[in-house]
Design a protein with these regions (language model features):
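Short beta-strand segments
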Residues: 4-8, 59, 91, 123-125, ...
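Electrostatically charged, flexible surface regions
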Residues: 151-262
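A glycine-rich helix N-cap at a beta->alpha junction
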Residues: 71-100, 183
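Conserved acidic residues
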Residues: 86, 119, 179
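Short Gly/Thr/Asp-enriched flexible loops that form oxyanion-binding sites at enzyme active sites
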Residues: 130-143
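N-terminal beta-strand-loop-alpha-helix module at the start
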Residues: 1-60
Length: 262
């Protein structure tokens, strides 16, 4: 059983650094494995322990600068190997720092296709810092593998897999075949902690590093441009001899501004 687990190095919400102006200092805030991704990793390891195979971790560093973050990031990746993953494939490139959800998803999709085919792809339902809940669905469209989200239980059978989806007021059971992408909730398991022996053994497990140029991405802008659009009041005062005249003028202004259509 070939198992791919996607890990995000999120901002450590317990160690947020705030500057004197009250703005979160992203560069000084430490990284940590996103909580739901710990559940994804645990589930991948449990599947490997039951059916055999290999767990491969995939990740991209999205907080920079890369030169400053790399040691902390690789510590996190090494932690996933200590917990039980067999190898890790990571993207280290300044072009992905601050990239959009689509750009990061595309980079990881190309990376996983470059490495090989997998029977099951597991990710957390959302990251603990941005919580966009998008990755599983985006990955599905990019590698053409069906995705089932918000899964709280996985039962792999001889030819099929039963997935228990956690909806608001019910549990939905879906029967499907492999390969499949699964995003898991926090209720699916209790993540384990690595032993000292596992931590030492993790140093011998491989971490494969890639840049954006290694992934044959299409030409698109991986940079983020932030512009603050000027906002100013027009200070239009509506005056008239009576309410009827004022109402007519107000309606005309609203129509001219495109706010009102009659």
């Amino acid at each position: 059983m070939n198992i791919a687990v996607f890990i995000k190095a999120s901002l450590n919400l317990n160690l947020i650094k705030v500057d004197s102006s009250g703005i979160v200092n992203l560069e000084e805030t430490a990284l940590a494995i996103s909580e739901y991704d710990k559940n994804a990793l645990e589930e991948g390891i449990r599947i490997k322990e039951k059916f055999g195979g290999k767990v491969s971790v995939f990740s991209a560093l999205t907080y920079g600068p890369v030169s400053k973050r790399q040691a902390d990031y690789e510590r996190i990746i090494r932690e996933t190997l200590a917990i039980g993953a067999d190898e890790a494939h990571i993207i280290l490139d300044e072009k992905l720092v601050g990239a959009s959800n689509f750009e990061v998803s595309l980079a990881l999709a190309n990376l996983v296709k470059k490495v090989g085919a997998f029977d099951i792809y597991i990710t957390g339902e959302a990251s603990m810092d941005t919580s966009s809940y998008q990755f599983a669905s985006r990955l599905s469209s990019l590698i053409n593998v069906p995705a089932i989200t918000f899964v709280r239980k996985i039962e792999i059978q001889e030819k099929d897999v039963l997935l228990y989806r956690d909806l608001e007021d019910e549990i939905q059971i879906i029967k499907t075949s492999l390969p499949v992408i699964v995003s898991v909730t926090g209720e699916i398991n209790q993540p384990r902690l690595p032993t000292l022996k596992q931590i030492l053994q993790s140093k011998t497990k491989p971490i494969f590093k890639y840049s954006v140029t290694d992934l044959e991405l299409p030409k698109f802008d991986l940079s983020k441009e932030i512009r603050i659009l000027p906002v100013s009041r027009k200070n239009i005062f509506v005056e008239g001899k009576n309410l009827e005249e004022i109402s007519e003028k107000l309606i005309k202004y609203l129509i001219d501004e495109g706010v009102l259509k009659i």
